Amino acid sequence: MTRKYFGTDGVRGRVGEAPITPDFVMRLGHAAGKVLAHGAKTGQGKPTVLIGKDTRISGYMLEAALEAGFTSAGVHVLLTGPLPTPGIAYLTRALRLSAGVVISASHNPYYDNGIKFFSADGDKLPDAVEAEIEAAIEEPMVCAPSDDLGRARRINDAPGRYIEFCKSTFPHEQDLYGLKLVVDCAHGAAYHIAPHVFHELGADVVSIGNQPDGRNINDGYGATAPAKLVEAVKAHGADLGLAFDGDADRLQVVDADGRLYNGDELLYLIVRDRQAAGQAVPGAVGTLMTNMAVELALKRQGVEFVRAKVGDRYVLEELNKRSWTLGGEGSGHLLCLDRHSTGDGIVSALQVLAALRRSGKTLAQLLEGVRLFPQTLINVRVQKGFDWQSHAGLQAARAAVEPELEGRGRVLIRASGTEPVVRVMVEAEQAEMAERAARRLADALGA
């Protein structure tokens, strides 16, 4: 399906530039409201949507625009204020609402923002519904009669409800007493949520990245910038550090020695913990970028591994297709569908902590069987529109390289979606093997 406005994770861009302008966002809210009203069942009354946001200064402006759009279409609005993206998904489902909307650009800088929708079930909107909304945006915006306008009000207990939900995903027989955690909230939506979750379960919590000012979200803190977390873990003598991104749907973990663990390793850890608890795990889903060492380690444990396109949306699609529950990507998007309908950094952290408590081991001990393969990435500049798949020299080089790597590495070649570059990535057991193979492939492209 060709999309004009919706990307793989909603509508996103630079604030003040199309499409992230107040007038467009109001039209977007109105269009989504019309689609929801049209699909509402007879006798259910007006649809109601939940709107949450992260801590970007532009969130106030875009929240007001969305509110105007929805209410002008005859849709009621509930406002949560700053709340993690997965919190909006949870509350949308728990409150039996028509849809949820998040104003966030996730891990991007503060000057970007975006709009993401959740269905009544707390899932990403189906493509067909997004297509309906895009079509409705192009129609004239007609305000509902005064008697049919929607109302807007704030939910004052949204953070508390979500905190209790997060805690409910942690085993009731376990607690976090005696554990010292550093929690990095990226000056984002989890700043007033995550520390409370872990503290209420018994942990001694040191918070960093928890003073948002509207412009410092993701700036030197959080899952995409873990250096300060590593420093804080060592400085405070903490057992573990947890880093979330701006909307708290990603997780990175640091151990007491300052070693960083990414989403690939954490996915393996959670799968193994489910198995240790006696739960059958027939398969797990990663992406094209998931480290091969994780795939091989899972297969040794009898777990089938499937690769989706990059993006948690596609991981979720593959999980649903197979009725599996566990998936994720190296960036820290982890899906535990037996706990939540969407990726949730706080819930994922609780699954990691549950594994540590259940086993009595450290992260390093639990992940002894997974040594990530070294990766070599070479970006080769090409002419715009270049078709690397038809390049005879590259295909010949690939045909020679892949048999040498079989069972010990892999090749991934893909075109960049944003610049005239072909990305050549090789993973192998040994760094020298990966570098040699990647250079051979890049040279075949004329690098």
UniProtKB/Swiss-Prot annotation:
A Pfam family per the record: PGM_PMM_I
Keywords of the record: Isomerase, Magnesium, Metal-binding, Phosphoprotein
Reaction it catalyzes: alpha-D-glucosamine 1-phosphate = D-glucosamine 6-phosphate
HAMAP family: GlmM_B
NCBIfam families registered for this protein in UniProt: glmM (TIGR01455), PRK10887.1 (NF008139)
Record's protein name: Phosphoglucosamine mutase
Listed EC numbers: 5.4.2.10
Record organism: Cupriavidus necator (strain ATCC 17699 / DSM 428 / KCTC 22496 / NCIMB 10442 / H16 / Stanier 337)
GO biological process: carbohydrate metabolic process; peptidoglycan biosynthetic process; UDP-N-acetylglucosamine biosynthetic process
